[in-house]
Amino acid sequence: MEGPQELLSGKLRLCFTPAARTSLLLLKLNDAALRALQECHRQQVRPVIAFQGNRGYLRLPGPHWSCLFSFIVSQCGQEGPGGPGLDLVCQCPGRSGPNRLHCLGPLRERLTIWAAMDSIPAPSSLQRHNRTEDARDRESWQNVGDYPEADTISQSQMGLEEVPDPLASSQGQSLPGSSREHMAQWEVRNQTLLPNRDPDQALPPSASQKHVDKKRPAPAAMVELKQKRLRTLAPSPLQGLPSQDLQEEDWEQEDKDEDMGPRLEHSPSVQADSESLSPEEVPDYLLQYRAIHSAEQQHAYEQDFETDYAEYRILHARVAAASQRFIELAAEMNNVQRGTPEHKALEEKIVQEYKKFRKRYPGYREEKRRCEYLHQKLSHIKGLILEFEEKNRGS
């Protein structure tokens, strides 16, 4: 991760010395991922990586923090079928001299780590984080989906090796790779509580907290965060997008998908509506997750919740970051009178930016639908767990 010590100039000799049985990847990552990797190297801890097809997760563990990134592997450096690729060349000091370079092998694939990072810091870490860090440029959403059309399949669930608990708090250590955007997402999620419940009213401890080490008391902050993780879901990142102002065909078609209602929470009306649907229209999670009747069933539901929640948070961060620019433009349109030249110019600007956005982020629709699906599924599971705990507390 260190740059060259001196500039290369003059005539250079290139030697081909590829390493045997070694695959080389071109790594593309943002500053947050780089800082987290550097911190892992400094702490001498090994990152955990999980592949499934061309996608995967990268977890960077630390003593009191944990960062979770998503990535995709794609072809790199080719101008077309059979076109020239990229080679990894290094300058090795020694008897060969400074003007001798060594080619270690071709770079056929690129591993891109998304700028949208999923991390779970403790509240004390958030309060002590350096607030002078520059905010991400508003145009950075264009780099969120830089991958080919063939890689637009939705993310599927995948297992990861065990890493230290990301909810463990630290009173004096900030989270490497965090930013104000992630702190804002954390605050929004913590402020989104269940309906008909006082924000200050604590939920009953769930079965997942029974597995806390009984040899020492669990920190109050960790228990509270585990409760919030079960009881709160971030509001849909798709709310606030315009739904009727634009007349362009491409944007109108997307608006039909963007016109989402308020976020779904567990309620009797939701279950009543689902019962009137045909079997083909009923979501699979309504058939799979019925009322809970035992502690073992509750524990299984909680495990499924945690598994889907990790994927949901990554997708939510990506979709929210991609949608934020259009939410800002829609807010500008609301402040301009319809029919005026300013309104038409702004409308044209949104259409053009949207067309460029579709090319840069071809998998946006699929990830958006997957994010909404997980949001509704997690809300359903959460409601069943709370309903079971409420029933047991009253008996």
Swiss-Prot record:
Residues 124-149, 163-182, 194-218, 233-279 are annotated as: Disordered. InterPro entries: ELL/occludin, ELL_N, Occludin_ELL. Keywords: Nucleus, Transcription, Transcription regulation. The keyword Nucleus applies. Enhancer-binding elongation factor that specifically binds enhancers in embryonic stem cells (ES cells), marks them, and is required for their future activation during stem cell specification. Elongation factor component of the super elongation complex (SEC), a complex required to increase the catalytic rate of RNA polymerase II transcription by suppressing transient pausing by the polymerase at multiple sites along the DNA. Component of the little elongation complex (LEC), a complex required to regulate small nuclear RNA (snRNA) gene transcription by RNA polymerase II and III. This is RNA polymerase II elongation factor ELL3. Residues 246-258 have a biased composition (Acidic residues). It is found in: Nucleus. Gene3D superfamilies: 6.10.140.340. Interacts with AFF4. Component of the super elongation complex (SEC), at least composed of EAF1, EAF2, CDK9, MLLT3/AF9, AFF (AFF1 or AFF4), the P-TEFb complex and ELL (ELL, ELL2 or ELL3). Component of the little elongation complex (LEC), at least composed of ELL (ELL, ELL2 or ELL3), ZC3H8, ICE1 and ICE2. GO terms for molecular function: cis-regulatory region sequence-specific DNA binding. Its main location: nucleus. Belongs to the ELL/occludin family. The keyword Nucleus applies. GO terms for biological process: positive regulation of transcription by RNA polymerase II; positive regulation of transcription elongation by RNA polymerase II; regulation of epithelial to mesenchymal transition; snRNA transcription by RNA polymerase II; stem cell differentiation; transcription by RNA polymerase II; transcription elongation by RNA polymerase II. PROSITE patterns: OCEL. Residues 168-177, 268-277 have a biased composition (Polar residues). Pfam families: ELL, Occludin_ELL. Residues 130-140 have a biased composition (Basic and acidic residues). One of its GO terms (cellular component) is transcription elongation factor complex. Residues 283-393 form the OCEL domain.
